[in-house]
A protein has these predicted regions:
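Fold-level recognition of mixed alpha/beta catalytic cores in primary-metabolism enzymes, strongest
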Residues: 144-207
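Gly/Ser-rich catalytic/binding loops embedded in alpha/beta enzyme cores
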Residues: 1-159
Length: 207
């Protein structure tokens, strides 16, 4: 257990260092204070010590900012729309229950209504590999954060390509599950009939 926790502490440090060194502020709308994540490592350690099965302990994630994370504002890239949720969206809660740790909220095309990654007052998210090119959207920040190695995985959404397009343009894996398999409660809707919560990772092996 101690090795796992030390690895998680190192992973948290590495994520924040990667974000700082990349100098790509447009990827993120909000980051948790590093001290909060370090405190959560101790909580994960206590759960492991109590015998909890935490298959995702050691993985660092990000959340597209149209999905609720308790204590972090949800903006959908529209500052005047911002609200502070008191509870995690079920998709986030399930991952936390499995030991995952989230460091912040990522940028997106406003209200998840774009496929280019440029329609945000928080900045146009540039492609991970060629900053002169678009990242794709609307889950632009989540895809680029994963491609740059700032996090192990990230949540996004897909209504009409918002997960698949940035995954393809940034050379990572993007999975759109069967609609209804993952709850969209706590997600700012673009289309209630079509919205899906998606996940990004650099390889399939992560899952």
């Amino acid at each position: 257990m101690s090795a796992t926790i030390e690895a998680l502490r190192a992973a948290v440090r590495n994520s924040y260092q990667s974000i700082e060194s990349a100098q790509r502020p447009e990827v993120w709308i909000a980051l948790r204070p590093q001290a909060e994540d370090e405190a959560e490592v101790d909580e994960i350690a206590a759960r492991l010590a109590a015998g909890a099965n935490l298959p995702l302990a050691g993985l660092i994630g990000a959340v597209k900012d149209n999905i609720d994370v308790a204590g972090l504002a949800t903006t959908a890239a529209a500052p005047s729309f911002s609200y502070l949720p008191s509870a995690d969206a079920p998709a986030v809660a399930r991952l936390r229950d499995a030991g995952a740790l989230f460091i912040g909220k990522t940028n997106l095309d406003q209200f998840a209504t774009g496929l280019v990654g440029t329609r945000s007052p928080y900045g146009a998210v540039r492609n991970a590999w060629d900053p002169d090119r678009i990242s794709g959207g609307s889950s632009s920040g989540s895809a680029v954060a994963v491609a740059l190695g700032q996090v192990d995985f990230a949540l996004g959404t897909d209504t009409a390509g918002s997960g698949r397009v940035p995954a393809a343009l940034n050379g990572i894996v993007g999975v759109k599950p069967t609609r209804g398999l993952v709850s969209t409660t706590g997600v700012v809707p673009a289309s209630r009939r079509l919205d899906c919560v998606t996940v990004f990772a650099r390889t399939l092996a992560l899952g």
